[in-house]
Swiss-Prot record:
It is found in: Virion; Host cytoplasm; Host nucleus. It comes from Murine pneumonia virus (strain 15) (MPV). The gene is M2-1. It comes from the Viruses. Phosphorylated by host in infected cells. Only dephosphorylated M2-1 is competent for viral mRNA binding. Cyclic turnover of phosphorylation-dephosphorylation of M2-1 is required for efficient viral transcription. InterPro entries: Pneumovirus_M2-1 (IPR009452), Znf_CCCH (IPR000571), Znf_CCCH_sf (IPR036855). GO terms for molecular function: RNA binding; structural molecule activity; zinc ion binding. Contains a zinc-finger domain on its N-terminus essential for its anti-termination function. Contains an oligomerization domain. The central globular core is responsible for binding to RNA and phosphoprotein. This is Protein M2-1.
Length: 176
């Protein structure tokens, strides 16, 4: 075992375990190295406490300024703007607002809307696709990644079907 401090341990955490040949004993380290480790640790804490970044923006690119567009236009407004190519709505913003719409949809109402119109096969297919996305919604990072990888045409068709199904559900709720 060397007396030299492990550079990975100085920067945070050494994942080599017993295979590491360098010193992990802090009391043997020189003061300069201890100060350097303290600086790394404080920077890491500061990075995690920074309010400008959050987990959702790290994964999907769907950060705070984009969520304000959703707040101003509404989730359906963002989706319609993406379809019409207005208001400078990007694919990641549309995927994020699509997820919020899917979270707000009730599975039972979507199944009821699907069963009410059994003649149209395209409508049945889109309802089943929406139900499968609703089932996967508990894995938010994964579903954002899946939606962002969809081709633009497929994503636009999915958005149109979600909007039409949501409007049908809302109109049936208002009549009852």
């Amino acid at each position: 075992m060397s007396v030299r401090p492990c550079k990975f341990e100085v920067q945070g955490f050494c994942s080599r375990g017993r295979n590491c040949k360098y010193s992990h004993k802090y009391w043997e380290w020189p003061l300069k190295t201890l100060m350097l480790r303290q600086n790394y640790m404080l920077n890491r804490i500061y990075r995690f406490l920074d309010t400008n970044t959050d987990a959702m923006s790290d994964v999907s690119g769907f950060d705070a300024p984009q969520r304000t567009a959703e707040y101003a236009l509404g989730t359906i407004g963002v989706l319609k703007s993406y379809l019409e190519k207005t208001n400078n709505i990007t694919k990641s913003i549309a995927c994020g607002s699509l997820i919020t719409v899917l979270q707000n949809l009730d599975v039972g109402l979507v199944i009821q809307a699907r069963d009410s119109n059994t003649e149209d096969t395209n409508y049945l297919r889109s309802c089943n696709t929406i139900l499968s996305y609703i089932d996967k919604i508990h894995k938010k990072r994964q579903i954002i990644h899946i939606l962002k990888r969809l081709p633009v045409g497929v994503l636009c068709n999915l958005i149109q079907s979600v909007i039409s199904i949501e409007e049908k559900i809302n109109s049936s709720m208002k009549t009852e």
